[in-house]
């Protein structure tokens, strides 16, 4: 189930405030956020937002294709190092 239309998309209030202030001043610098659940809105296009992945902030450049998605979708929290290799010596015995 999606979010109710009368509520609108969730965006962290402080993040939205920072983006709107930067738009008024025509500034483009990095914005750090921990809010992975925030929805990307059209006012964020062209900004670089550093989203926390649990260890560090990963910079994401917002494009028009990302509108409607969540910030956390573009920053993986887990590093996949591959499946366990087959032990051929043990298989022969």
From Swiss-Prot:
It comes from the Bacteria. GO terms for biological process: ribosomal small subunit assembly; translation. Keywords: Ribonucleoprotein, Ribosomal protein, RNA-binding, rRNA-binding. One of its GO terms (molecular function) is structural constituent of ribosome. Pfam families: Ribosomal_S19. InterPro entries: Ribosomal_uS19 (IPR002222), Ribosomal_uS19_bac-type (IPR005732), Ribosomal_uS19_CS (IPR020934), Ribosomal_uS19_SF (IPR023575). GO terms for cellular component: cytoplasm; small ribosomal subunit. NCBIfam families: rpsS_bact. Protein S19 forms a complex with S13 that binds strongly to the 16S ribosomal RNA. PANTHER family: RIBOSOMAL PROTEIN S19P FAMILY MEMBER, SMALL RIBOSOMAL SUBUNIT PROTEIN US19M. Belongs to the universal ribosomal protein uS19 family. This is Small ribosomal subunit protein uS19. It comes from Synechococcus sp. (strain JA-2-3B'a(2-13)) (Cyanobacteria bacterium Yellowstone B-Prime). The gene is rpsS.
């Amino acid at each position: 189930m999606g979010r109710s239309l009368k509520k609108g998309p969730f965006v962290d209030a402080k993040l939205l405030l920072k983006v709107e202030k930067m738009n008024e001043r025509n500034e483009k610098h990095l914005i750090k956020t921990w809010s992975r659940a925030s929805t990307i809105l059209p006012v964020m296009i062209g900004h670089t937002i550093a989203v926390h992945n649990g260890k560090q902030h990963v910079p994401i450049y917002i494009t028009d294709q990302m509108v409607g998605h969540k910030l956390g979708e573009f920053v993986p929290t887990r590093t996949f190092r591959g499946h366990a290799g087959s032990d051929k010596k043990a298989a022969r015995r």
